[in-house]
Amino acid sequence: MDHIKDLLQFLDNSPVNFLATETICQRLVDAGFERLNACEKLDNIKPGRQFFFTKNDSSVYAFRIGSEPLSEAGFHVICAHCDSPTFRIKPNAEMTGEGGIVRLNTEVYGGPILSTWFDRPLTIAGRVIVRSEDVMCPITKLLQVRRPLLQISNLAIHFNRQVNDGVKLSKQKDVLPILGIINNELEKGNLLVNLICEELNIEQKDILDFDLY
């Protein structure tokens, strides 16, 4: 039972690859692994020690140096991916339709079963690149909104009579999530950015880019 709870906690803290990477790194540190900077000279690699490093904030490479010669003991490799099918939010994503309904322009990431995403509460997670005092070294901030924000809604059946017969879904039209409703022009184009600023306690002018899902 403890293993199941641990797995569920890991999944809850790792909705996208960036957050999964952070969670894995913390677990490695807790297990006695040492973090390496892959851009620096590695001169402390010795038998019996264990290390890890990351790439692009989205993948982790961990290894343990054995005490036996490599030619005699060989080595073991275990690989897994930490991303999963989802929807990636495009830049300038807000699309305002009739009645002020705001949807987010997204692209399908991976191979999701589209029908399973309808009529359920969804949220946003990923990373935001933020301006720092050093123009050449922006800061990466991880974002995980732990409350419902979005929904991909089915049409009522009298607007889609064939829904129970199997309807082909358009990835460009039918699965764009609804973010909210705006009441005036001042809100237009700012809902998502304002949400990011509120969650991360940053200024809009400092946002350089984001990878959000």
Each language-model region and where it sits:
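N-terminal hydrophobic/helix-forming segments and targeting peptides
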Residues: 1-213
